[in-house]
Amino acid sequence: MFKVLAVDHIGIAVKDLEEGKNFWSDVIGIPCTAQETVAEQKVTTTFHPTPNKSEIELLIGTAEDSPITKYIEKKGEGIQHIALRVDNIENAIADLMAKGVKMIDEKPRIGAGGAKIAFLHPKSTKGVLLEICEHEDR
């Protein structure tokens, strides 16, 4: 059995990372505290933590075949995924699969900030791309 600890972050696909970063930092007042390129996922991300430790994650593709680049081409900018922080990602994946949830990732992989991540297929989540994640330091 696993436990959901919090909404970890909301991932927003953007065409211009600097514009997005400036909006969330200067207009909304949630400063960017980290920027990272995750080569394996062909994405650059920025993180804007809120006082309750949930974050806004901005994502931009770094290649034409990046899932984020393809997402923006198909659907435009906007919310791309919601991530839930879990206490044990391996248990979460096993429990979800046992309940018939279709997983994009049947094993955790490493995402931004070194988090262990896995995605649930939108066909199992009523159309929402849902990420589960586990952080060593949270």
Regions picked out by a protein language model, each given a short descriptive name:
Residues E18-P31, M97-K99:
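Amphipathic alpha-helical segments
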Residues F2-K3, T46-P49, I56, L84, ...:
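Vicinal oxygen chelate
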Residues G29-T37, V101-K107:
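Short secondary-structure junctions
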Residues V7-V14, W24, H48, K53-L59, ...:
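Short, structured motif recognition centered on aromatic/hydrophobic residues
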Residues M1-E19, E77-V86, E134-R138:
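N-terminal beta-strand motif that seeds the catalytic metal site of vicinal oxygen chelate
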Residues V43, D65-K70:
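A short, acidic/glycine-rich surface segment
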